[in-house]
């Protein structure tokens, strides 16, 4: 056994590849061939693929030292295969590759010296060795056959009698063979050469007549080599028969590469069918070779799927020594075809052939054939058919018996006769002697020459052989073919007189016979008189001469191109005329004329076709112009009609608008009658503004509140931004799809741009934004508008641009035009100029050489004093990332100072500040109002400042920054108005700038004077990272004005740093490949989206979410159970495998084919606002095996509404919470889903979504509970249990109450009256999300999607980074200035405890509870003197205030009017006051609320309660009047991060005493479990609405150590840790700010001599504990 030898050969570039400037993607080193993917960036894993073969031939450039010639290929492959044939083996060499890859050149070669291919060289070498080794005892005989396979039809190329398609048969011993294929005997190499030449001529004639090319047909040249050796000792003659198969396959290119259509495409499909089958055979044989040898099952090899593979069966994995030559192209434009060829060759390496020596095959074969013939004769006789035998075995006559054959099976008889005739043909061929074979070969040759002569093909004078030669005198035609191998193979004489040309069907015999389409019976006549040939066309004959259609007779000149019909192309040559022209030119020494050029230049088939297109193009242009004129007229006519229709529609719509306007006015007049004012009060429009009754009567406080609300909502832009993203996503996808198809290497993606100091909008985008309004009368700063833009990443030029949405839509029109023009351009048409069609490429913009690295800002307030300062400021890019640092010195110039830098530049300038310059576009961030500060940080900033002022007593307090300005209220003498002031700005160094930038320079200017900028010289940036020294000194002289002084106080100077990249193109520009600081978790959207409710068949589509005022919010705990029918007839909850890492997640373990019920239990605190009436519907749908779901699955038939059982309110002993439970029967088979009907496969998880529609009292809509459940279905009798050992050993799954899944929901009750107001309807507008709309060519984007809502979150983080950087820069400047002025006189450094407090506060500020809107402005904190002093209120005052509060809220009832008991109620509208982050920070506010704590104590008769302490209890809720609400139930995705977990002693209001519970803190929720092993959440506390208290007064009152309380809106909890060291840890997990405050207070007391130490506090607590125990 031996493997197939595989060689790869790469050819040089052809003319087409050179014209397209193709690049070489093939590399060869030894036997390894590497191919580079031009579509993949270099230096990646997929860019280069390497293959190892037996031989790799580099024939790309003949100048290379490793160039492989034809002889080298033959020495490696041909000589080895020839030696195998002499050894008696079958041999096969086949060439594979796309058209034009060099297969025919490698196999056949050319006529020139050293250009022969493998077939001629192996034949020549064969006869050379025969002559050298032939003796009397060793005789050789050689026979050849030549066939062509085209469209699964086999054609004999050597015998003209075999005009039809030959039949492929199979014999048990011979295998597949071609019946009646000529096998001709040859005696020397010249015979083989002549046969190859004649076969090619026959192939050329047939291909021309049928409009074929050799690239679409397979050619198989077979040599039958027989060796007869006579042994003198035994007097026996042995034979060895070898079959040498040399195959030239058709082109293997894809159909889309050839551009074939119609019939050509069908032919190509048949050709590719053979090649496809060949590939299947190669792959199947490779898989068989790679499998283990002991496989019992026989592998199927699809040999019979095509004639080619069926004939080559023995050569592929059978009895043969096989070699494959893969011919490939080196050009990048043929990458796909070349890679496919290399993969085929790589698979072919694994094929194993089992070659054996073919010895003494004829004797055995003849014997078996005779036996088979005798059996067939007996069979025919049994059928009643007589067979007459003659002496010759080659002839038999079959006589059928009509009487008996009627009663027999006709098909069996015909098959037997067919087999008999085939076997007799084989016997006759085998018994034929060598002399008879030579005689038959000669007869076929004579017949072949007669056929050629009859067709008009020229023969030599002896009339014996056919050859290609150039006649000396006679004019002639030479054929031209698309395939160079078939060109100039046929020669037709033009005899003296008339030479007729037509088909063989003509009445008059034609001298030259052609066939094919568009050839008439009598097509034309050539008249030869005195060596002048005139072409006479017949009527309706299609004839072109030199590209012009011939209508009248024309004299042919030598070198003329003659096209007959559509397919037959010839070159006319008149030797006498050519000789006369040459002699005339030589004698007269004239210049070369056109005739000589035509005769001497290369004239081939391509030249003739191009000439035809060029000459016929004149008529085509005229026809095209006529067609364009018609289209233009049609366009004008249709446009006129469209304008008329549009005018009519406009008038119709205007009339409708007028009618609606009148209707609105009538309704307005009708409604005005109900007003308290008469209509005469506002007859005129301006009365609304001038009538005193419409003047505002607001107080100053009301006006301030209105302004606050206006400013607050003016900064909320998320909805409009999302609408822009959704609405324009389809345009972005279309632009990217067109870019990919046109190979523009341009990408488009959404981006958000905000006009800030660090990221000013480009001028073209700034013009699309409304002008920035200055601050209003209430001091509101200007709005920084955020807009949606398109980021254009030009990877070809390495540039990044920003387009507006309008510009994208305009450019998209040009892109569509370019795409249509590209699609309509013909492959043969000349390249068009893009600029001439569209005025420029719409994909590209001009880009500057220098790119912006970043910006920096330096404040100038040190010039007020005046003192010099040296700043080190960050260089920040537009995304808020620090790209380096800049050192700047700013100092006043009070006298003539000399600055000397070695390489520095010193310049001077003069500026003038006008009065308008005092109002800059941007405001400093420290001038934001406290209201917006509260919006941004959830009220933390003001409390943190208060904490720092009270607790620390030093550091940077709120007046730190203002002290500098207080000293500068009166400017010094150097800043007197009217005088000139000079200051110096020195750009020292830049550090930390990336090595990708070169030639760094700095440019700076005042914020309002962009046109007057100062620039440094460029500095070379080395990769060593050394600081870049600018040392640029700029003296600026300014006449002092009030605006200039104001600018020094508040505004900075802007520094811009530029540079350009080291390498080009700048493909890394858009990637921003540097380490960026990730946003905090609170800035990110939810990682797993909450599923939307399943659409109910009963309620229909869900209405829009209401946006009215939220009256109340409640935390709801929901338990989900899936019960299965047990053997005892009861429904038992199925086992739930709870997740340890993800809270409220679990996996239901179900059994197949068992009745089920879904049980849902709702748990919440008792309240009069939430009362469950009934369950309306429970819908289950979206059955899937992935966690993600889509709303499109609601349209499926798998959505099922379950049968319901009545809901019931439960009462749990010892638990006063509200419980509501309902069940529904679930027949999962009704979903008709295979996922639920069958047993789940290994590792498969099934997901469903259920939605419960519940009815509540006083609610206009149902409340919807939606939950995603995951499950695994086992067999009916399988034992289910947790798959994890932890849950299995715990045994909790045996407890029915543990087999439930928990969901945490937030129930929001909104006012229903506002649901239909016009303002709400406007806010509920829905914009269609076009990101999922299909765009043609979208599949080329490979899953790319436009960015959506996540872009808004990312942009918010970028803006927050910019905000922080600006604040830090300003504060660093103030600190540096204070230090320079010596104002920071505090000698005590900051203690470690105070640093811990700051860290705690910073961590709390980044809690997910609070959302930051960094772009909103802030104003200074209110003056502490304006804060109303706090006071103690007596009981009557407190009752009165609560009563007034209820009256304002509309919650006060008559029953409370006579109720003298005061109730401290925390209503839903008081959530802001009950916020733990607000009420738990200030110690003063805590002490003022002591009366609330004391009133929230339970009765003193509790035996188990601590002495003197009662559990904190909430106030009871007052009775609510009848009111309609709109409920919203939203599932809360609980954070997986555990802040603290452990055991706590819990005492709750209404409980029976202390209980030890397992508590887990997942902010902002606290979950309470029965024990550590309990997997179900039994209670939940919302820390966002809870009040945490831990003070010495409380500890002294309860007399129990290590306690703290958590008070919610509905109940209070007293929590006790198991150890005194755990108190701070639990407090830090629940409320970090309170823990930091207590720790800071304890640390501060250690520094005060009169304070009580921590040990004394512990001793006191211990004493109290002892007394309590006694």
Curated annotation (Swiss-Prot):
Transmembrane segments: none annotated. One of its GO terms (molecular function) is GTP-dependent protein binding. The keyword Lipoprotein does not apply. Residues 1537-1635 form the PH domain. Keywords: ATP-binding, Cell projection, Coiled coil, Cytoplasm, Cytoskeleton, Microtubule, Motor protein, Nucleotide-binding, Phosphoprotein, Protein transport, Transport. It is found in: Cytoplasm, Cytoskeleton; Cell projection, Axon. Expressed in muscles. Residues 963-975 have a biased composition (Basic and acidic residues). Disruption phenotype: Flies prevent nerve endings from transforming to synaptic boutons: growth cones become constricted but remain within contact fields as thin processes that lack varicosities or boutons. Mutant embryos die at late stage, they are paralyzed and lacked the coordinated muscle peristalsis required for hatching. GO terms for biological process: anterograde axonal transport; anterograde synaptic vesicle transport; axo-dendritic transport; axonal transport; filopodium assembly; larval locomotory behavior; negative regulation of synaptic assembly at neuromuscular junction; neuromuscular junction development. The modification Phosphoserine is found at residue 1416. ATP binds at residues 97-104. It holds the Pfam family KIF1B. InterPro entries: FHA_dom (IPR000253), Kinesin-like (IPR022164), Kinesin-like_KIF1-typ (IPR022140), Kinesin_assoc (IPR032405), Kinesin_motor_CS (IPR019821), Kinesin_motor_dom (IPR001752), Kinesin_motor_dom_sf (IPR036961), P-loop_NTPase (IPR027417). Residues 951-975 are annotated as: Disordered. One of its GO terms (cellular component) is axon terminus. Its main location: cytoplasm. Residues 3-351 form the Kinesin motor domain. Residues 499-565 form the FHA domain. Disulfide bonds: none annotated. The modification Phosphothreonine is found at residues 1406, 1419. Belongs to the TRAFAC class myosin-kinesin ATPase superfamily. Kinesin family. Unc-104 subfamily. Monomer. Interacts with Arl8. This is Kinesin-like protein unc-104. It comes from Drosophila melanogaster (Fruit fly). The lineage of its organism: Eukaryota, Metazoa, Ecdysozoa, Arthropoda, Hexapoda. The gene is unc-104.
């Amino acid at each position: 056994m031996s493997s197939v030898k595989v060689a790869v050969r790469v050819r040089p570039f052809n003319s087409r590849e050179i014209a397209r400037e193709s690049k070489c993607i093939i590399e060869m080193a030894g036997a390894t061939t590497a191919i580079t993917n031009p579509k993949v960036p270099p230096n990646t894993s997929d860019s280069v693929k390497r293959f190892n073969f037996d031989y790799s031939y580099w024939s790309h450039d003949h100048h290379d030292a490793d160039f492989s010639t034809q002889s080298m290929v033959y020495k490696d492959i041909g000589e080895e295969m020839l030696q195998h044939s002499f050894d008696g083996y079958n041999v096969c060499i086949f060439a594979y590759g796309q058209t034009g890859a060099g297969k025919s050149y490698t196999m056949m070669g050319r006529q020139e010296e050293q250009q022969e291919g493998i077939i001629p060289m192996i034949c020549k070498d064969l006869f050379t060795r025969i002559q050298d080794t032939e003796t009397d005892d060793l005789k050789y005989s050689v026979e050849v056959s030549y066939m062509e396979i085209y469209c699964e039809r086999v054609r004999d190329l050597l015998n003209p009698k075999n005009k039809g398609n030959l039949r492929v048969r199979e014999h048990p011993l011979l295998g597949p063979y071609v019946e009646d294929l000529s096998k001709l005997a040859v005696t020397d190499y010249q015979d083989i050469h002549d046969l190859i030449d004649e076969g090619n001529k026959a192939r050329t004639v047939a291909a021309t007549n049928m409009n074929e090319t050799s690239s679409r047909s397979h050619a198989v040249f077979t040599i039958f080599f027989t060796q007869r050796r006579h042994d003198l000792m035994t007097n026996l003659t042995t034979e060895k028969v070898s079959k040498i198969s040399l195959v030239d396959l058709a082109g293997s290119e894809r159909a889309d590469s050839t551009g074939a259509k119609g019939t050509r495409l069908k032919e190509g499909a048949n050709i590719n069918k053979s090649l496809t089958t060949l590939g299947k055979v190669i792959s199947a044989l490779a898989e068989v070779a790679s499998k283990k040898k002991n496989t019992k099952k026989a592998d199927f090899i699809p040999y019979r799927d095509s004639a080619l593979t069926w004939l080559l069966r023995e050569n592929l994995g059978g009895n043969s020594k096989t070699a494959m030559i893969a011919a490939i192209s080196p050009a990048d434009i043929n990458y796909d075809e070349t890679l496919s060829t290399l993969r085929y060759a790589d698979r072919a390496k694994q094929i194993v052939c089992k070659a054996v020596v073919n010895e003494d095959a004829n004797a055995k074969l003849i014997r078996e054939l005779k036996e088979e013939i005798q059996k067939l004769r007996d069979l025919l006789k049994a059928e009643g058919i007589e067979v007459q035998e003659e002496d010759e075995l080659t002839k038999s006559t079959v006589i059928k018996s009509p009487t008996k054959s009627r009663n027999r099976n006709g098909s069996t008889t015909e098959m037997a006769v067919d087999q008999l005739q085939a076997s007799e043909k084989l016997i006759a061929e085998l018994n034929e002697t060598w002399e008879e074979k030579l005689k038959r070969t000669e007869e076929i040759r004579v017949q072949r020459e007669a056929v050629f002569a009859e067709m008009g093909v020229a023969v030599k004078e002896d009339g014996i052989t056919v050859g290609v030669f150039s006649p000396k005198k006679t004019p002639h035609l030479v054929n031209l073919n698309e395939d160079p191998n078939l060109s100039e193979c046929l020669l037709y004489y033009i005899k003296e007189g008339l030479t007729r040309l037509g088909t063989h069907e003509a009445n008059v015999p034609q001298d030259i016979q052609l066939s094919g389409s568009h050839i008439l019976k009598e097509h034309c006549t050539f008249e030869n008189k005195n060596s002048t040939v005139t072409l006479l066309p017949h009527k309706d004959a299609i004839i072109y001469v030199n590209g012009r259609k011939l209508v009248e007779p024309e004299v042919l000149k030598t070198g003329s191109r003659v096209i007959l019909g559509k397919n037959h192309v010839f070159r006319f040559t008149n030797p006498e005329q050519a000789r006369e022209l040459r002699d005339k030119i030589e004698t007269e020494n004239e210049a070369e004329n056109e005739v000589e050029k035509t005769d001497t230049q290369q004239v081939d088939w391509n030249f003739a076709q191009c000439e035809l297109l060029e000459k016929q193009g004149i008529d085509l242009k005229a026809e095209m112009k006529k067609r364009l004129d018609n289209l233009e007229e049609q366009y004008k006519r249709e446009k006129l009609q469209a304008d008329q229709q549009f005018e009519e529609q406009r008038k119709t719509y205007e009339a409708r608008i007028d009618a609606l306007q009148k209707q609105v006015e009538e309704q307005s007049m009708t409604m005005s009658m109900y007003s308290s004012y008469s209509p005469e009060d506002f007859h005129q429009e301006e009365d609304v503004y001038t009538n005193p009754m419409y003047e505002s009567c607001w107080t100053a406080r009301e006006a301030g509140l209105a302004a606050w609300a206006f400013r607050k909502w003016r900064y909320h832009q998320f909805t409009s931004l999302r609408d822009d993203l959704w609405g324009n996503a389809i345009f972005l996808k279309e632009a990217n799809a067109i870019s990919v198809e046109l190979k523009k290497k341009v990408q488009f993606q959404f981006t958000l741009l905000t006009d800030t100091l660090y990221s000013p909008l480009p001028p073209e985008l700034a013009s699309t934004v409304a002008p920035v309004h200055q601050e209003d009368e209430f001091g509101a700063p200007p709005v920084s508008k955020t807009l949606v833009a398109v980021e254009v990443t030009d990877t070809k030029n390495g540039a990044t641009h920003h387009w507006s949405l309008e510009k994208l839509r305009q450019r998209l029109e040009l892109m569509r035009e370019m795409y249509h023009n590209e699609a309509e351009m013909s492959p043969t048409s000349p390249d068009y100029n893009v600029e001439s069609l569209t005025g420029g490429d719409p994909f590209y913009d001009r880009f500057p050489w220098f790119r912006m690295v970043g910006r920096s800002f330096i404040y100038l307030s040190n010039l007020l004093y005046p003192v010099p300062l040296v700043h080190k400021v960050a260089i920040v890019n537009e995304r808020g990332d620090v790209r380096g640092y800049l050192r700047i010195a700013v100092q006043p110039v009070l006298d003539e100072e000399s600055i000397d830098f070695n390489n520095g530049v010193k310049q001077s300038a003069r500026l003038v500040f006008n009065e308008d310059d005092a109002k800059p576009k941007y405001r400093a961030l420290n001038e934001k109002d406290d209201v917006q500060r509260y919006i941004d940080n959830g009220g933390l900033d003001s409390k943190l400042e208060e904490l720092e002022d009270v607790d620390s007593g030093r550091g940077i307090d709120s007046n730190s920054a203002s002290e500098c300005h207080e000293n500068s209220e009166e400017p010094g003498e150097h800043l007197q108005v009217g005088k000139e002031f000079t200051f110096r700005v020195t750009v020292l160094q830049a550090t930390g700038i990336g090595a990708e930038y070169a030639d760094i320079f700095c440019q700076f200017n005042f914020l309002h004077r962009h046109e007057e900028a100062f620039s440094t010289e460029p500095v070379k940036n080395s990769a060593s990272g050394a600081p870049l020294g600018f040392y640029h000194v700029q003296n600026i002289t300014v006449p002092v004005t009030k605006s200039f002084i104001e600018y020094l106080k508040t505004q900075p100077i802007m520094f811009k740093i530029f540079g350009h990249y080291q390498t080009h193109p700048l493909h890394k520009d858009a990637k921003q490949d540097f380490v960026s600081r990730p946003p905090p978790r609170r800035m990110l959207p939810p990682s797993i989206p909450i599923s939307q409710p399943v659409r109910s068949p009963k309620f229909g589509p869900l209405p829009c979410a209401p946006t009215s005022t939220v009256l109340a919010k409640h935390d709801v705990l929901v338990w989900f159970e899936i019960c299965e029918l047990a053997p005892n007839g009861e429904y038992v909850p199925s086992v739930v495998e709870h997740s340890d890492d993800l809270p409220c997640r679990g996996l239901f373990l179900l059994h197949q084919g068992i009745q089920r019920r879904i049980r849902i239990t709702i748990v919440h605190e008792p309240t009069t606002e939430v009362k469950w009436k009934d369950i309306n519907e429970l819908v289950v749908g979206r059955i899937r095996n992935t966690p993600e779901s889509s709303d499109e699955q609601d349209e499926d038939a798998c959505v099922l509404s379950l049968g319901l059982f009545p809901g019931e309110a439960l009462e749990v002993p010892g638990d006063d919470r509200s419980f509501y439970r309902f069940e529904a029967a679930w027949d999962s088979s009704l979903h008709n889903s295979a996922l639920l009907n069958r047993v789940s496969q290994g590792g498969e998880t099934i997901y469903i979504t259920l939605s419960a529609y519940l009815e509540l009292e006083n609610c206009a809509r149902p409340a919807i509970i939606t939950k995603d459940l995951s499950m695994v279905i086992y067999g009916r009798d399988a034992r289910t249990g947790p798959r994890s050992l932890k849950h299995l050993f715990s045994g909790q799954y045996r407890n029915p109450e543990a087999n439930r899944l928990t969901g945490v929901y937030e129930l929001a009750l909104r006012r229903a009256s506002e649901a239909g107001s016009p303002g709400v309807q406007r806010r509920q507008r829905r914009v269609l999300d076009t990101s999922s709309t299909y765009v043609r060519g979208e599949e080329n984007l490979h899953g790319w999607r436009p960015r959506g809502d996540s872009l808004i979150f990312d942009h918010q983080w970028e803006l927050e980074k910019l905000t922080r950087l600006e604040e830090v820069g300003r504060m660093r400047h103030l600190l540096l200035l204070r230090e320079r002025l010596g104002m920071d006189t505090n000698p005590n450094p900051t203690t470690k405890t105070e640093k811990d407090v700051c860290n705690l506060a910073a961590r709390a500020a980044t809690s997910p509870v609070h959302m930051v809107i960094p772009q909103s402005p802030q104003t200074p904190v209110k003056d502490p003197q304006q804060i109303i002093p706090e006071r103690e209120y007596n009981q009557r005052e407190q009752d009165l205030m609560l009563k007034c509060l209820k009256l304002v809220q509309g919650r006060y009832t008559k029953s409370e009017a006579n109720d003298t008991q005061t109730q401290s109620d925390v209503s839903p509208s008081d959530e802001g006051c009950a916020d733990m982050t607000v009420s738990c920070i200030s110690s003063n506010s805590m002490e003022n609320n002591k009366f609330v704590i004391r009133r929230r104590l339970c009765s003193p008769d509790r035996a188990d309660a601590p002495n003197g302490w009662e559990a904190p209890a909430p106030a009871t809720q007052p009775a609510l009047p009848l009111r309609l609400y709109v409920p919203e139930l939203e599932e809360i995705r609980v954070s997986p991060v555990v802040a603290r977990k452990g055991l706590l002693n819990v005492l709750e209001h209404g409980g029976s005493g202390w209980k030890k519970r397992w508590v887990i803190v997942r902010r902002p929720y606290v979950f309470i479990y029965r024990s550590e092993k309990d997997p179900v959440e039994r209670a939940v506390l919302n820390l966002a609405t809870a009040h945490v208290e831990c003070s010495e007064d409380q500890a002294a009152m309860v007399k129990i150590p290590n306690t703290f309380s958590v008070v919610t809106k509905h109940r209070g909890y007293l929590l006790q840790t198991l150890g005194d060291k755990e108190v701070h840890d639990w407090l830090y997990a629940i409320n970090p700010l309170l823990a930091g405050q207590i720790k800071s207070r304890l640390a501060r007391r250690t520094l005060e001599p009169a304070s009580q130490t921590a040990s004394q506090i512990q001793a006191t607590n211990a004493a109290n504990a002892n007394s309590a125990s006694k």
